[in-house]
Amino acid sequence: MHNPKISIIVPCYNQAQYLTEALQSVLEQTYGNWECIIVNDGSPDNTEEIAQEWVSKDSRFIYLYKENGGLSSARNAGIAIAEGEFILPLDA
């Protein structure tokens, strides 16, 4: 049976207040072969702290920081390191 890996890309800029809910929705999926790449697009809020909590809970969460470059730039940075056969964008 084919069980492809899904790469979920979550670009974040000043969305810390929504990040936990978005990442919890990923964790609650019934399909388990995924990685979730949280891309902090230079947020001055506490996005990094929240993301690091999730990374420490589950190795399928990956954190990436980059200088602010906008939504497309953040998505592309996540896609560049994605290992999945399919890409799923998810906005926090």
Which role does the model predict for each range below?
Residues 87:
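Short aromatic/hydrophobic "clamp" motif used to bind/position activated sugar donors
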Residues 23-64:
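Acidic donor-binding segment of Leloir-type glycosyltransferases
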Residues 66-82:
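Glycine-rich, basic loop-to-helix element that forms the pyrophosphate-binding segment
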Residues 1-27:
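N-proximal low-complexity "stem/linker" segments adjacent to membrane-targeting elements
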Residues 67, 90-92:
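Catalytic metal- and UDP-sugar-binding loop of GT-A-like glycosyltransferases, i.e.
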Residues 14, 43, 70:
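Alpha/beta-hydrolase active-site loop signature
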